[in-house]
Amino acid sequence: MSRFIDFTLPSTVPGRTLHGFRCVPEGPVRAVLQLSHGMVEYIDRYRPLAEYLADRGILVTGHDHLGHGASIRTKEDYGYFAEPDGNRAVLADLHAVTVLTKELYPNLPYFLLGHSMGSFYARQYLCEYGRELNGAIIMGTGFQPKALVKIAKTLCRVLAAFHGWHYRSNLVASLSFMGYNKGLEGRTTHDWLNRDQAEVDKYLAEERCTFTFTLNAYYSMFSGILRLHDPAFLARMPKDLPLLFLSGDADPVGEQGKGVRRAIQSLKDAGVQNIESIFYPGARHELLVETNKLEVFGDIAAWLDKQLAKQ
């Protein structure tokens, strides 16, 4: 049986603390997979995947990003990253967990999985710290139009001038998720997440999944997304790093696959060569709790096995 170890770690932001877990295999550890979770959720939602992989010799670790899960001081911290540069803080914290994990489990192949917002941070991470990885899985990602992201970022800055960076703007939130539930109206506002209605209801009943982002977090996230439109930044990614993109072909974040393919093409244009992708018919955004989640778990494990066979 694998075992979970909860841990805390000082954030790279003074005075803040990160909460995380490690799921340690009972037998020999073959590799490490670090997780970067999505927007308005928390790392413990990934425990089923962690157990599945740990039973196959993969140690899985991850933490709650700032403003998420247990990485808060009070509930007022929900949806707030950091000032003056929240995007940098989230990236630096991801790397701090990498450093800690490599100190505890040295000389092992090391992989990163990022979902949704966490996928955008994972893609930035690959450009800054990619040489510390043996591969990465990019899940539930997209490719937002540069002009729209710039407008959204400017709107955040204007609103913050009047209300401050802790302000929670319903306008920005509405614009960010506009159209995601199109064609699914009538039951909940979040059926775009998943075909499994019980999982959607569970998500909506969870306090850690229903807060509104602050202007600070939106501005930080938009800043990071804009970096992914910069060819010079993407060119910093190791060209031979193995990547696996996973997406539901009914995921609105990835524009039903079109945005995911644009993200892949942007990396190919930057010279990245080793990219695979899987699109799941009918699946929506949250693949790890979708109706075909065991298929997704198996594909992740199989891809990791393939990479380890090359080591």
Where are these regions (language model features)?
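N-terminal cap/lid segment of alpha/beta-hydrolase-fold proteins
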Residues: 1-27
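Active-site glycine-rich loops that stabilize anionic/oxyanionic intermediates
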Residues: 36-41, 116-117, 249-250
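Conserved alpha/beta-hydrolase
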Residues: 48-76
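Alpha/beta-hydrolase active-site loop
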Residues: 82-102
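Alpha/beta-hydrolase fold nucleophile elbow
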Residues: 105-116
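Alpha/beta-hydrolase-fold enzymes
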Residues: 122-208
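Short beta-strand/loop motif that positions the catalytic acidic residue
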Residues: 245-247
